[in-house]
Every structure is written in structure tokens, then in C-alpha cells.
């Protein structure tokens, strides 16, 4: 691994499920080591199915430089899941999804029922 690898990390913007707004932002931050070098964003549907496609597009804007992809979980905008295998196959970059806490299966089940 290089001394200062170039990574792109993704997370979604906050949103309110009770609002009539149906989109939120998918935000990517490109860093070289600890230095931020670029920020990219795309709108994604809340509980939609476009996060994978949008994430791939954002990576491709920087693919010449980016060496690794990091994501905060595998869901964005509620239940808009990303397909890690498809992302890897299309951009040929290692991708790591990070959870900062244990998933509450009961809360997920309740949200899906609603």
C-alpha cells in the first residue's frame, strides 16, 4: 500500500421520512492520506434503488486517482441498498462497507413492515 493512498468515502445526507421530499444526497469525499482533495455528490431516492448506479458514477468521476472505496454501511437514503459486487466489477477498485454499530434487526423489520 502507498504511503498516502487515495480513497473515496461515501455517506448519505440526513433526511426526514415524514417529509414529502423523496430524495437525499449521496456524498463522496476523496482524500489522499488525511488531506481532502475533492467532494462529489448525487441525488438518490429515499428507499429507492439507484444508489449503486449513482455511487459508480461518482467513483468514475475520480477513478483515475481513487485506489479504494469506503462506504458507511450498505444502505443509503433509508433502504436504498448498494450492490458491492457490481460496484467492484464495474470500477475494479476494492470496496469496504463499514458499520459503526451492530444492526438492530428488530428495528429494521419494523421499518420494512411500515
Language-model features: where?
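Gly/Ser/Thr-rich loops at beta-strand to alpha-helix junctions
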Residues: 14-16, 73-82, 101-104
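Structural beta-sheet core signal
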Residues: 9, 28-30, 97
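Long, charge-dense
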Residues: 83-114
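Short coil/turn connectors at secondary-structure junctions
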Residues: 2-5, 64-66, 92-93
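Two-metal-ion RNase H-like nuclease active-site motif
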Residues: 2-19
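A glycine-rich, hydrophobic loop/mini-helix early in the fold
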Residues: 21-77
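Generic internal hydrophobic packing segments that stabilize the cores of diverse globular domains
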Residues: 52, 56, 81-88
